[in-house]
Amino acid sequence: MNIENYLSETLAKVFQKLGYAESFAKVVTSTREDVGHFQCNGAMPLAKFAKKPPLAIAEEIVEHIDAEDIFAKLEVAKPGFINITLAPKFLADTTNRFLNSNKFGVQNNLPNRKVVLDFGGPNVAKPMHVGHIRSALLGDALQRIHRFCGDTVVSDVHLGDWGTQMGMLIEEIKLQSPQLVYFDENYTGEYPTESPVTVQELAEIYPRASKRCKSDINEMEKARLATFELQQGRRGYVALWQHFVRISIDAVKKDFDSLDVHFDLWLGESDANKFIDEMISYFQANNFIYEDEGAWVIDTNKDGVPPLIVIKKDGGVMYGTTDLATLWQRSKDLDPDEIIYVVDKRQSLHFKQVFSVAERTKVVSEKCKLKHVAFGTVNGKDGRPFKTREGGVMHLADLISQAKEYAKNRMPDENDDSIIDQIAMATIKFGDLINNYANDYFFDLEKFAQHEGKTGPYLLYTVVRAKSILRKIFGDNYDIKSLAKDYKVVNAHNEYEEKLQLQLIQFPIAVQRAYENSQPHHICEYAYSLANSFNKFYVNCPINNLDDESLKKARIALCMATVKAMTIASDLIGISIPERM
């Protein structure tokens, strides 16, 4: 139950009764704790339509509200705010209801939807680096959130395995080892099962090939021709390319496993290749595509968005072509309600073109919503894209090792590597996801690793503290679900209990905002606020030495609720919580 929605519905009945539109009854969390828990600001915009002063409208609404079981206090403030304070029993009862629900008050979306999530997107032959973090972590959080809310999710890594870089690699290896059978056009036998290069060698070959092609137009033409021949099915090139893909996927899977990020599908641009001819024929049959200076293009019919080149002059396909073919494939195979792409904001124009063409040509059905979660860049302290001290791109594996070092340095007596791993992951993931995805942000690992402030380790520390209370009382194998039946939250005895209860019942609000806006930072902010409220409660509300047994049990229930809410919230952003720290 989203408490903002519940209160909005309660006030909407009064608005309707008085002849006002229900849309003005929206209730939001108060921006000032000193005046109330929630507020309704609808009287101000309503005044223009009702031809009344907003203060008079607010007073009229409050006068007609009859819900003493929900509200302890309703106050009107200029120019027309309605400040709402919840009744202590309603607050306690709602906390209990959430504690005893499987999803801490969150209800499944109805009807359930099928959502395809496209994220990760590493390129073959390139090791994963810091720049891949945002897509991987943001996409993983979104798939967790969508599944939690009841959607059927299909996640796809969508490998970059079919572009000009493949031709660059082929030509570079051909230059180094022309004797390999992959380059003999007359060879008809079976190709070797072992790759002629390792993934480490690929990572060295690609920069060299890229540099050569950028400095020599003839080399670039060779790479483009090799790419075209690969896409046309030249046997030796296909066999060599298959080695590139296989060894790259093995390496990439290890990187994603280290982040606890997983995919349902491991498809790439190449998997859409077999749909391109069928799709082009469809475009031609329906007069969507036309020739322009030797290339084949499709108009977007959107102001400021240029046409999409589908086939180049040389007959090769573009990045946009494979993206359209991927949409074609997904639409036919999965029939989704929504497809979400978690990709760098520098690709925004590209996705505007692809989405516009896909919708105009009905590559996707009318019910299917296309969304680009366009995230900002990961920058260093200097405000530029994050680099190593030597100025190079930091590989993901090196970043994780560095995070583990920070965790170990702050806990030198900790010998359990699994706990160090959990702290390192919390450091990286929370440090990234606490930021609104649309913004660039500074990646400061030293700051993220602190055990206080808005950090992952602080969250872990708080939950471990709450768990230790329960463990001292119930032993190691306690079960919150069964214990909650006998431990009930009661009306708050002080401001610390009240603020903790109020924070706990706002969990569904954070989840709904994260879900609707594809913004996991709402869950991060919620978890941080809950951690602060619990730590103040912990300091000011003793449990073990209490003589009042009913109060003791009520505070234990608040500890249970905190552990449950924090555990779910942490899982939604891909963070696992240790038993101790």
From Swiss-Prot:
Keyword presence, ATP-binding: yes
Predominant place of localization: cytoplasm
One GO CC term on file: cytoplasm
GO biological process annotation, one example: arginyl-tRNA aminoacylation
Enzyme type, top EC level: ligase
Substrates-to-products reaction catalysed: tRNA(Arg) + L-arginine + ATP = L-arginyl-tRNA(Arg) + AMP + diphosphate
Subcellular location: Cytoplasm
Residue positions of motif 'HIGH' region: 122-132
Listed EC numbers: 6.1.1.19
InterPro entries membership: aa-tRNA-synth_I_CS, Arg-tRNA-ligase, Arg-tRNA-synth_N, Arg-tRNA-synth_N_sf, ArgRS_core, DALR_anticod-bd, Rossmann-like_a/b/a_fold, tRNAsynth_Ia_anticodon-bd
Family to which this protein belongs: Belongs to the class-I aminoacyl-tRNA synthetase family.
The name this protein goes by in its record: Arginine--tRNA ligase
Source species of the chain: Francisella tularensis subsp. tularensis (strain WY96-3418)
